[in-house]
Amino acid sequence: MGSIQNSITGALGAAAGAAVAIKHTKDSDFSKMNSADNSAIISRNQARAATAEANEATNEAKKDGGLISQLSEAEVTEGEAKKAFEKAANRKNGSPITILNKMTELKAAKKAADTLRDKYKAVEDLQARATEQRRYAAKATQIALDEKTKYEKRWGGIR
């Protein structure tokens, strides 16, 4: 009798252990699904924020008198300063003071244009970051959908 009772007790223990293991597995799968979903939500929010920031910077740059027009003017000024310097440097009997002044003007124009180029590069970087965030958000959303589908197939729906 003892051995039958031990067998039954062992079988019940194994069944209870299996039930607990199944519950833990289901909970783990549910947790994975929720984590993926939360990551997707966060990614989408970050993508929206990055897109808004990039759009704002781009719109500001495109305004009249904005970064794009300033950069265009600075590049024209830089080109004119370069021509004036070269003309002064190539003159016969050119005054060293005139050459020095033209070189100073050229350096100032170049520095102004470089500063504006750096600002424009920052706007382009914001746009690239927003694009990358949108791409990442799309991947995270797909992963979340895949996890949800796996959970529903394995466990017959969401609790």
Report the location of each language-model feature.
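Extended amphipathic alpha-helical heptad-repeat regions
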Residues: 5-159
